């Protein structure tokens, strides 16, 4: 079963867990599945390999990031401090 119009990919849960939770899951999954900017080459070509591991499809760079997004708020702060 694919998604539904209201909750997209979270439609796989059917009527379980409540609409608010399913909408939240759908929003996180949509952000996770889109292409992200590579920190090495700057191209929008980063895809998630597994939990917290991201790879650029153009330059092949593999790096660790957040579970659902390649850059977390804490990671942004740490990078700013290091620079």
Swiss-Prot record:
Query: How is this protein annotated for GO cellular component?
Result: ribonucleoprotein complex; ribosome
Q: Could you give a single Gene Ontology term from the biological process aspect?
A: translation
Where does each C4-type zinc finger lie?
A: 38-59
Q: Name one GO molecular function term.
A: structural constituent of ribosome
Q: How is the cofactor bound?
A: Binds 1 zinc ion per subunit.
For this protein, the parts annotated as crossing the membrane are: none
Gene3D superfamilies named in the record: 2.20.25.30
Residues that hold Zn(2+) according to the record: 38, 41, 56, 59
Q: Which domain of life is it from?
A: Archaea
Which keywords appear in this protein's UniProt record, sorted alphabetically? Metal-binding, Ribonucleoprotein, Ribosomal protein, RNA-binding, rRNA-binding, Zinc, Zinc-finger
Q: How does it assemble?
A: Part of the 50S ribosomal subunit.
Q: Which HAMAP family does this entry report, sorted A to Z? A: Ribosomal_eL43 (MF_00327)
Stored PANTHER family: 60S RIBOSOMAL PROTEIN L37A (PTHR48129), LARGE RIBOSOMAL SUBUNIT PROTEIN EL43 (PTHR48129:SF1)
Family note:
Belongs to the eukaryotic ribosomal protein eL43 family. Putative zinc-binding subfamily.
Cited function = Binds to the 23S rRNA.
Q: What is this protein called?
A: Large ribosomal subunit protein eL43
């Amino acid at each position: 079963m694919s998604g539904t119009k209201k909750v997209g990919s979270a439609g796989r849960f059917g009527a379980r867990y409540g609409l608010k939770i399913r909408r939240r899951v759908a929003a996180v999954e949509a952000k996770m599945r889109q292409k992200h900017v590579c920190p090495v080459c700057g191209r929008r070509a980063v895809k998630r390999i597994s939990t917290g591991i991201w790879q650029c499809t153009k330059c092949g760079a593999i790096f660790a990031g957040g579970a659902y997004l390649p850059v977390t708020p804490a990671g942004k702060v740490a990078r700013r401090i290091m620079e």
